[in-house]
Amino acid sequence: MSRVCQVTGKRPVTGNNRSHALNATKRRFLPNLHSHRFWVESEKRFVTLRVSAKGMRIIDKKGIETVLSELRARGEKY
């Protein structure tokens, strides 16, 4: 399963670890992803989404119905 937020599209980015001596070693910054079940009242069922913390805040703000309609418009499976 890829580490991509289904709502925001956040994905891992690359950067460097920096030691005290400023040696650079490659690393990945991973998004804060969680599998979360959301109740969809219109469908009378739970929908499981893999979302970041920011994605959960967007769902709280817009509502799950609106977010799911945006996912459908993008052709995203959920």
UniProtKB/Swiss-Prot annotation:
One of its GO terms (biological process) is translation. Gene3D superfamilies: Ribosomal protein L28/L24. The keyword Ribonucleoprotein applies. It comes from the Bacteria. GO terms for molecular function: structural constituent of ribosome. The keyword Transport does not apply. Keywords: Ribonucleoprotein, Ribosomal protein. One of its GO terms (cellular component) is cytosolic large ribosomal subunit. Belongs to the bacterial ribosomal protein bL28 family. This is Large ribosomal subunit protein bL28. It comes from Salmonella typhimurium (strain LT2 / SGSC1412 / ATCC 700720). The lineage of its organism: Bacteria, Pseudomonadati, Pseudomonadota, Gammaproteobacteria, Enterobacterales.
